[in-house]
Amino acid sequence: RLVVAESGVHTRAQGAAAELAGADAILVGSALMQAPDPAEKLAELLSRPLAKVCGLTREEDVEAALDAGADLVGFVLEPASPRAADRALPVPETALSVAVWVGEAGDAGTDLDQVHERAEGKVRGRDAVLLRDGRPVGRVLDLPWEEDDAGHWERAAAVAREERVMLAGGLGPDTVRDAITAVRPWAVDASSSLETAPGVKDHERIRAYVEAVRA
């Protein structure tokens, strides 16, 4: 049986939503016909890594992320985090919302849940799982990029060849392109590198980061 998502796919996030829902194929005729470069639009919809901006706490920062073209917007719902949000803010259907939890997922009404194990009160990124409707759909690898160890890249790339990987850890406008080239992840995630203070985003850095992901 072939499951086809027939309509309404105009953004990379919508294509990812169809994929995560179990679609084997999507119809994107109108989106391609309206695009100046159909081949470029097809690659945009189907193949490039998703860009996630996480640690959002303010409506103006959510708007800046969406205006920049972010595919995923993340809200940390762990009270102990310096980037804790009171709730997941509304997100249009052109993007996907992600609730970030430590220990177990609650019910935030988001498209995805990102659940980290609790270890001494800290998020342990390598053990994170992405859930859709309670079902695992991918992993988060939070790698220590500040350490000059090529093995990190190689191990992450090996995992990314077998399953959906969201890559995180020190990613920002200046580092995300190299990470994408080395690992070929399903998505990339940035938070602290896009801030002026915990939970307060720098809109220019958000834009530069998303542009680097799309480059």
Which role fits each region the language model picked out?
Residues 5, 9-28, 58-68, 103-121, ...:
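Catalytic cores of alpha/beta
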Residues 5-6, 30-31, 52-57, 72-84, ...:
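Catalytic beta/alpha-barrel core
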Residues 17, 87-92:
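Short, aromatic/basic amphipathic alpha-helical patches
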Residues 21-42, 70-82, 116-121, 144-146, ...:
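Glycine-rich phosphate-binding active-site loops on the catalytic face of alpha/beta enzymes
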Residues 40-52:
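Short domain-boundary/entry signatures in modular proteins, especially
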Residues 46, 90-96:
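Short acidic, glycine/proline-enriched helix-loop-strand junctions
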Residues 53-56, 139-143, 147, 152-160, ...:
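Internal alpha/beta domain cores that form substrate/cofactor-binding pockets in large enzymes
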